[in-house]
Amino acid sequence: MRDYTKQYINGEWVESNSNETIEVINPATEEVIGKVAKGNKADVDKAVEAADNVYLEFRHTSVKERQALLDKIVKEYENRKDDIVQAITDELGAPLSLSERVHYQMGLNHFVAARDALDNYEFEERRGDDLVVKEAIGVSGLITPWNFPTNQTSLKLAAAFAAGSPVVLKPSEETPFAAVILAEIFDKVGVPKGVFNLVNGDGAGVGNPLSEHPKVRMMSFTGSGPTGSKIMEKAAKDFKKVSLELGGKSPYIVLDDVDIKEAAKATTGKVVNNTGQVCTAGTRVLVPNKIKDAFLAELKEQFSQVRVGNPREDGTQVGPIISKKQFDQVQNYINKGIEEGAELFYGGPGKPEGLEKGYFARPTIFINVDNQMTIAQEEIFGPVMSVITYNDLDEAIQIANDTKYGLAGYVIGKDKETLHKVARSIEAGTVEINEAGRKPDLPFGGYKQSGLGREWGDYGIEEFLEVKSIAGYFK
C-alpha cells in the first residue's frame, strides 16, 4: 500500500492543509493500492507563493545551468526506471512491457529533448540596433491526465525547467504515483526550492484554485475538452496564457495500394495501444471500397491475436480501462453504435471471457459506420474502431476532416505523391505517414477543438516564455 499523503512544496514534503485523502484503485484488480492527499486552496496558495518567491532567481539562471539541471534529472530518472514502470502498471493497469517501452521511455525522451533543445535555442535575437528577448513567463500551473502519467507530466515539466519557469503540478488523482516519483527525483538532484511544487487532489479542490490564482501566469492542461474550456474561462479572468492539449477522433486513411496485412496490423495497434486510452488514437479507419473485404478479413485476424489480460503476465498486450466510470462510458458507446445501426464486426459489449474482475473491455470493431454516427464523432477513449469506406481520395479527405477535432491523422500506402497529398490535406496538428512515429523534438498539438499551443521540444519551451522587444539596445 502506497501512502503519499504529503504535498511537495518549496523543496519539502509537508502535511496537506486538508485531512482528507483520495484512494487510488488498481483497475486490473479493483483493489485500493494507495492513497494521496486531497489538497485544497490553502495548499495551492502555499505552493504558488513558493514558486513566485523563486521566480526571478530561476528566470535569471543561465542556459547552461538549466541544461545541467535537466541532465541530472535524466540520469536520476534512469536510475528510477523500475519504480516508474511498477507504479504505472499498478495505477494505470498498463502491461509491464508497455509501461517500460512507452510510458517510462516517453517520459525520459522529453527530458532529453528539452535538454538537447537548449544546445541551439536562441533566447535573444539582435535586429539591427534592437534586441528581442525571450524570458520565462513566470509561475506556471500544470494539470495532467491519467492516461500517460509520465509522458504528459514530463513534457510540461521539462519545457518549463528549460525556459526557467517555476511550476505547480496537479497530476490526475487516478494516477498520481508517477508524479510523486518525479518529485523524489527532483528532490534528490537538487531542483531549487520552489521551482517544483506538487499538490495532489481533485479538480475542485486543486485544479480550480490553481487556474484562478492571480500569481499564476500560465496554465498548461492536458485532458478533456469540457475541462479545458472551464480552465480557459477561469484563466481569462486575469488573462493568463493557456496551453491546452485536448481530445481527438483521429482518422487513419488506408490507401488502395497498401500492403493489406501491414495496414491491418498498423490500424489495430493505433486502436488497442494503451487500451485505446490515447488522445491520438486512430479510431476512424477509412478504407477504399475496392479492398474492403480483404482488409476486414485481415483486420479480424489481427484483432483475434490481441491478448487482453493481467498486466503483470507475460504476453499481455492490453490491460484494463482506468476506472469503473470510464469502463461504463466505453460500454455506453458500444451500445450506442449498435443502436444507431453500425454493424458489430468484432468484440462488443461486456468483458472478455475469464476477466470478470477488473475493468477489462473487449477490443471492438464496427463496420458500415456513417461518419455522422456518435461513435465516429465522439471520443470514446477505449479500444473501439469504426471502419468507414470511401470511393475516392477526395471523399476520404472530406470524411477525415469532418470532425470537430484535429489532433492527429494517419495515412498508409505506397505512392509517395498520394501520401504527401493526404498528409498535407488532413486538418490536424500531427500527421504520420506509414507509421513513422512522432519524435520528441517535433511540435505536438491540435487544430480546432483539440487544443491551443504546442508542446514537445523547442516549441514546448516557447509556451513557457514571454517575448520582449528592447529598442535601441545596441545604439
Curated annotation (Swiss-Prot):
Coiled coil: none
Record Pfam families: Aldedh (PF00171)
Enzyme Commission number(s): 1.2.1.3
InterPro entries documented for this protein: Ald_DH/histidinol_DH, Ald_DH_C, Ald_DH_CS_CYS, Ald_DH_CS_GLU, Ald_DH_N, Aldehyde_DH_dom, Aldehyde_DH_NAD(P)
SUPFAM superfamilies with a match to the protein in the record: ALDH-like
Catalytic residues in the record: E245 (proton acceptor), C279 (nucleophile)
Alphabetical list of Gene3D superfamilies matching this protein: Aldehyde Dehydrogenase, Chain A, domain 1 (3.40.605.10), Aldehyde Dehydrogenase, Chain A, domain 2 (3.40.309.10)
Source organism (scientific name): Staphylococcus aureus (strain MRSA252)
Record protein name field: Putative aldehyde dehydrogenase
Domain of life: Bacteria
